[in-house]
């Protein structure tokens, strides 16, 4: 941008000088007109202020048709180079009404060019922006003029495309606001200040917007602040333009010189192929190189190193073959060994050759990555730059040669992957089967341990322990100390019953401790089926529970004396029976009972 146009007043002065009366035939000063359009496009001045400055100059020059024609020509230059923000102001009612008034005039000898120019500007704006809702007022003006019978120029078949490109001028983007940098996302603070990129309009921190570049395509000729992304794009375009310039210089060389170089290169290739034909009996095809104008500076050093390495390998192979042939000629008496030696060498070299075929070298991998990067960078380049880039074509040929090996390596990798997947599935199945077998084995071990443990009989009358000798003091003495023999008293009315019950009770009290003691011994346990007589005797005689606790001994004695409680007491009058109190918890008789019966009740 011109440094003189910094204010609206400076813009007005520049507009007056660009449309000066001293310029004949309504022409304008093109340099000043471009400065005005750059000032409008660079957004240094407001779009509305710029529009009003142009309108002011148009209204001032009504009396002079040549000056007014120059003013409208300056308006046309600014409209086509001012950017979208300026087009919105030009297509507003404030400016379009003035243009409609001029276009609606009848053509005369003096104003024919002026009226034709205004009509053409309106028609171009209508054709380009008739579907734009923000610039809809242009369509209204066009319809009103058509209703008045104004004739507009006829549109050619490709006129719409050309018109759209005519108003497509790049302008600085609108500034956006944010609380953090759009690259590093660091929040803005008092120290970390925000800066706007003059190219893309984004907001960035000082670290990512420290570059300064002029933006002539946006009307900014002095260096301004740009972000890192815009700076990288500028550098890429700069390097690509240099490469295109070198290529154009090479194409500008004399045609005879290029043909001489092609002939020399073709002659050298033919000589090298003739030498290789005499050695290896190979007949390669010779093709004419179309892009042979590449200079030594453009050759890839990595490619040259790879070619030299392949030539050295070929030479070593020829030397080995020559040595083998000389050894075979020197020892003709050993034909079998001479025949077996190449086969052994071939068998050793077969895996190496297969490995070389299925794998890529580091140089080939670098070539593939370099080719991919170049293709990615040349997406935005024109088609001529892609076709004329010799380095890209050389890399394409080299990468194309590695395609079979890439496919072979990819298939091999897929095969290995599928094999590993199958092996993983088999291992999973085997592990599940092994876990099942292990659980079954552990379950069998637990069951066998449970079945091997001795169990006491649940029915004491079904099995009988082997009795120990009755003379053993360990079975009789402890019970005699802890369980004294109970004494039973006879009564007058039930002496016979007591006499019958006493032997059974004594037998039960003597045999129960022995049986209880024998039931505790685990070793030597041999269950036997008891005899029917013993079973009937045991069932008919009352028995005590095994090893009764001390607190339950009185209850057991009561159970043993149950037959005594069946003594028939004499009947007494019913009206003298009384209920016992809660403290006694039993029924008592009236005072008419005898002292002997009271004593008997107390003993019970």
UniProtKB/Swiss-Prot annotation:
What InterPro entries has UniProt attached to this entry? ENTH_VHS, HGS/VPS27, UIM_dom, VHS_dom, Vps27_GAT-like, Znf_FYVE, Znf_FYVE-rel, Znf_FYVE_PHD
Query: What SMART domains does the entry give?
Result: FYVE, UIM, VHS
Q: Where in the cell is it found?
A: Endosome membrane
**Biased composition, Polar residues: where in the chain?**
507-523, 581-597
> Which domain of life does this protein belong to?
Eukaryota
Which residues are involved in binding Zn(2+) 2?
197, 200, 227, 230
Low complexity bias spans: 488-499
Which GO-annotated molecular functions does the record name? K48-linked polyubiquitin modification-dependent protein binding; K63-linked polyubiquitin modification-dependent protein binding; phosphatidylinositol-3-phosphate binding; protein domain specific binding; protein heterodimerization activity; ubiquitin binding; zinc ion binding
Q: Which GO terms describe its cellular component?
A: endosome membrane; ESCRT-0 complex; vacuolar membrane
For this protein, the record's Pfam families field holds: FYVE, UIM, VHS, Vps27_GAT-like
Where composition is biased (Basic residues), the residues are: 241-253
Could you list this entry's UniProt keywords, alphabetically sorted.
Endosome, Membrane, Metal-binding, Repeat, Zinc, Zinc-finger
Q: What is the membrane topology here?
A: Peripheral membrane protein
Q: Spans of biased composition, class Basic and acidic residues?
A: 254-263
Point out the signal peptide segment. none
Q: Where is the VHS domain?
A: 20-153
Positions of Zn(2+) 1 binding: 181, 184, 205, 208
Which chain segments does UniProt annotate as zinc-finger regions (FYVE-type)?
175-235
**What GO terms describe the biological role, i.e. biological process, of this protein?**
ATP export; cellular response to nitrogen starvation; microlipophagy; positive regulation of protein maturation; protein retention in Golgi apparatus; protein secretion; protein targeting to vacuole; protein transport to vacuole involved in ubiquitin-dependent protein catabolic process via the multivesicular body sorting pathway
Disordered, as annotated region = 241-263, 314-335, 465-604
What the entry lists under PANTHER family is as follows: VACUOLAR PROTEIN SORTING-ASSOCIATED PROTEIN 27
Subunit comment: Component of the ESCRT-0 complex composed of HSE1 and VPS27.
Q: What is this protein called?
A: Vacuolar protein sorting-associated protein 27
Q: Which gene encodes it?
A: VPS27
